[in-house]
């Protein structure tokens, strides 16, 4: 017998050369591969169970009283072991005839130290079976020619996922025993060993059982891998052979530490072509940058370091250019025609022009600090629940007019954007004649828009509710129920919190000038609206609402009409709206011409709107105009004491100007389909006249100061999100009427 071992072989093949006549094809030819983990035939179940029933009998010493038959059987088993130990390994690995070459199960799983078990199984099989000498290999698995052929080369076994490598030391005895059919092997071996005892002999049977139950002498445990039945020790990753990726699967801590110390040099020595190309490209870019930013400037340096010497030039003109074109040196606009420098008052006297703005300078902007006289706030006018956001972008000057543009542009989660300008704390005046020339937006018969030209006392800033809380629209100089919350009336005539800066404010409380009732009354030059006929018989017509907003209120909001004049009942009438719990409105409405609007089939002209007032308690009056025609006059006596309140004088506060274009459901029904966005409210000029002997222009007059008080409460005038006086961190001043 000869035994050769080819390390490239994957499947061990057994070839037994003997002088004895062996007719068993299972040993004379290459063994057909089959799954060593396949099910055994039913006739072998008892034998298989016995072969694995004991693990202690493998190393038992020879019994001193064993019979000759037992001794003979033992010698025969050792003889068979000698034959198996000289097994000749098969073809090279690339040409093996196992499972992966035929598409079937791999061949025998060879393991050193297990051949003694197989020899015992063979000798035991010869004692038990004498008749099946030439059993086909295909019947070993118990199928015996049936459709359940476990050696079908096109049907791989259930657990045979990897071929058994030649020379592997870690194939378990379990797989070998289940693969080598003990019954068939014993039958074939019995045919060539006639001297062995029969299976009926008790002694022989006992010896055979001991042989079958002997376990493998393999030093490796019979553990199992998670890959379906193979012992974990035979998993291919544990095979001791070199592969290109072994350094990934079996890292070497020593080599890794050495690599970390010299990572750069190691990578530099072992870089591939791609890495080399990247390195070369980086070097080229570095050299190019060095050449462009260092070498080239150094080569082209001219050495010019001579200091600058002023150049002399010829004076072409003696004209003195202004530093800034927007800066005005006079309150009267230079573009105002001289014919407008004077205005005839109600009593026939001529009042002089004290302020004007013709808006002839193109491209003026009105962001905070941009303009001398007007500022466009960036706020939502929440006092009247407007639907637009006032944005400085919507205000500019062009073609000699101030343009307030409203468009359907989403802004700050509102769907409309428009413009407002106000002269708060920049330009104020006390009594006089205010005249504004304007062209109203959209059509004259479409309701919904709210154009406004108005004025308000400087102690309140329009749109900043914290500043107006308790001062708007008060014009009151008494210490009685008129200064208390709700006017001390339970009937709901007033929801106002009371006059914050009243005449009887306690000492130590903040007040602009203690002892004088202060407030922020409102006088509207015009609030544009449209008169509609509910019957539908008359066409809609634009009207101008001209009002005095005041507090505290008369009973039922009705003043003494004996001191009110209307000049043309065909176009003007007293407003049916006289006020509400937040203000009393002494108002009249005047019909407007359709040609004074932006759109329409007729001409689009500008019209003047204004008011004139004197605040003397005895001779004072307030008169409104549309064009040069007066529409309504209210005398001071119309605001005499009523109920539990006293006189409400015409405003002595410094009044600031407000020009705006709004839209709100609180004002009028909005005819959305008929509004042609964008719409523009255009103002041609603003002019203020005063009696020559009573000129009072400024926001901080001596007798009615505002500056110090505003500075003491500046957050109320700069933060539109503060909606009440107390939200600004202040408390209402105490007064002597309630108790100091």
From Swiss-Prot:
One BP term from GO: (1->6)-beta-D-glucan biosynthetic process
InterPro entries linked to this entry: ConA-like_dom_sf (IPR013320), GH16 (IPR000757), Skn1/Kre6/Sbg1 (IPR005629)
Spans annotated as Disordered: 1-79, 120-162, 177-220
Protein's cellular compartments: Golgi apparatus membrane
CDD domains: GH16_fungal_KRE6_glucanase
Domain annotation GH16: ranges: 299-694
This protein's UniProt keywords: Cell wall biogenesis/degradation, Glycoprotein, Golgi apparatus, Membrane, Signal-anchor, Transmembrane, Transmembrane helix
Topology versus the membrane: Single-pass type II membrane protein
Glycosites: 399, 445, 486, 568, 593, 721
Bias type Acidic residues, positions: 39-48
Residue stretches spanning the membrane: 276-296
Main location: Golgi
Sequence ranges of Polar residues compositional bias: 1-26, 177-186
Single GO MF annotation: glucosidase activity
Compositionally biased spans, kind Low complexity: 67-79, 121-139, 198-216
Residues exposed to the Lumenal side: 297-740
Function of the molecule: Involved in the synthesis of (1->6)- and (1->3)-beta-D-glucan polymers of the yeast cell wall in vivo. It is required for full activity of beta-glucan synthase in vitro. It may be a beta-glucan synthase, part of a multiprotein glucan synthase or a modulator.
Family membership: Belongs to the SKN1/KRE6 family.
UniProt protein name: Beta-glucan synthesis-associated protein KRE6
Organism encoding this protein: Candida albicans (Yeast)
Name of the gene encoding the protein in the UniProt record: KRE6
């Amino acid at each position: 017998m000869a035994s050769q071992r080819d390390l490239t072989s994957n499947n061990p093949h057994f070839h037994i050369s003997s002088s004895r006549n062996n007719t068993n094809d299972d040993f004379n030819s290459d063994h057909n591969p089959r799954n060593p983990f396949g099910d055994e035939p039913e006739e072998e179940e008892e034998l298989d169970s016995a072969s694995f029933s004991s693990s202690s009998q493998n190393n038992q010493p020879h019994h001193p009283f064993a019979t000759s038959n037992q001794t003979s059987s033992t010698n025969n088993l050792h003889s068979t072991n000698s034959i198996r130990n000289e097994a000749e390994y098969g073809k090279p690995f690339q040409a093996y005839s196992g499972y992966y070459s035929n598409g079937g199960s791999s061949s025998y799983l060879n393991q050193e130290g297990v051949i003694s078990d197989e020899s015992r199984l063979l000798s035991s099989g010869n004692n038990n079976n004498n008749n099946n000498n030439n059993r086909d290999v295909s019947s070993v698995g118990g199928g015996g020619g049936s459709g359940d052929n476990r050696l079908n080369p096109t049907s791989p076994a259930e657990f045979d996922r990897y071929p058994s490598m030649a020379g592997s030391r870690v194939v378990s005895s379990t797989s070998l025993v289940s693969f080598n059919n003990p019954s068939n092997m014993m039958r074939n071996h019995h045919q060539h060993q006639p001297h062995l005892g029969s299976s009926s002999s008790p002694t022989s049977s006992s010896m055979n059982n001991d042989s079958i139950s002997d376990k493998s002498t393999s030093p490796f445990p019979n553990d199992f891998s998670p890959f379906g039945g193979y012992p974990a020790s035979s998993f291919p990753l544990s095979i001791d052979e070199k592969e290109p990726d072994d350094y990934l699967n079996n890292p070497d801590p020593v080599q890794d530490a050495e690599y970390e110390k010299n990572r750069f040099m190691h990578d530099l020595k072992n870089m591939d072509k791609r890495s080399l190309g990247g390195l070369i490209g980086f070097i080229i870019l570095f050299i190019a940058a060095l050449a462009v930013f260092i070498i080239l400037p150094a080569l082209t340096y001219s050495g010019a370091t001579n200091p600058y010497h002023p150049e002399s030039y010829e004076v072409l003109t003696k004209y003195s250019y202004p530093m800034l074109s927007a800066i005005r040196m006079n309150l009267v606009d230079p573009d105002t025609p001289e014919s407008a420098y004077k205005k005839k008052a109600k009593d026939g006297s001529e009042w002089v022009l004290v302020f004007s703005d013709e808006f002839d300078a193109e491209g003026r902007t009105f962001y905070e600090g941009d303009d001398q006289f007007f500022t466009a706030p960036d706020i939502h006018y929440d006092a009247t629940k407007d639907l637009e956001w006032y944005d400085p972008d919507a205000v500019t000057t062009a073609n000699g007019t101030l343009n307030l543009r409203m468009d359907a542009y989403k802004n700050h989660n509102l769907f409309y954007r428009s413009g407002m300008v106000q002269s708060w704390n920049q330009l104020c005046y006390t009594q006089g004649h205010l005249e504004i020339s304007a062209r109203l937006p959209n059509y004259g018969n479409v309701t919904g828009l709210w154009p406004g030209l108005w004025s308000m006392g400087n102690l309140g800033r329009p749109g900043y509710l914290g500043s107006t809380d308790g001062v708007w629209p008060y014009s009151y100089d008494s210490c009685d129920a008129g200064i208390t919350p709700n006017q001390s009336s339970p009937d709901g005539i007033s929801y106002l919190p009371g006059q914050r800066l009243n005449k009887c404010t306690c000492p130590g409380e903040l007040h602009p000038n203690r002892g004088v009732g202060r407030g922020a009354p409102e006088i509207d030059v015009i609030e544009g609206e449209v008169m509609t006929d509910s019957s539908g018989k008359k066409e809609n017509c634009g009207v101008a609402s001209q009002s005095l907003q005041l507090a505290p209120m008369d009973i039922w909001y009705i003043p003494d009409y004996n001191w009110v004049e209307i000049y043309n009942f065909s176009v003007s009438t007293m407003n049916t709206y006289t006020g509400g719990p937040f203000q009393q409105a002494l108002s009249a409405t005047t019909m407007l011409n359709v040609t004074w609007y932006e759109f329409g089939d007729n001409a689009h002209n500008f019209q003047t709107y204004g008011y004139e007032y004197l605040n003397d308690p005895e001779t004072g009056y307030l008169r409104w105009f549309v064009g040069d025609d007066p529409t309504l006059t209210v005398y001071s006596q119309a605001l005499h004491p009523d109920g539990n309140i006293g006189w409400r004088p015409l405003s002595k506060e410094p009044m600031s100007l407000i020009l705006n274009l709004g839209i709100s459901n609180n004002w009028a029904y909005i005819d959305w389909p008929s509004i042609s966005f964008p719409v523009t409210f255009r103002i041609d000029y603003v002019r203020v006249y005063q009696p020559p002997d009573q000129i009072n222009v400024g926001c901080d007059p001596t007798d009615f100061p505002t500056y110090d008080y505003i500075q003491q409460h500046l957050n109320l005038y700069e933060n539109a999100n503060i909606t009440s006086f107390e939200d600004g961190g202040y408390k209402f001043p105490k007064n002597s009427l309630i108790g100091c």
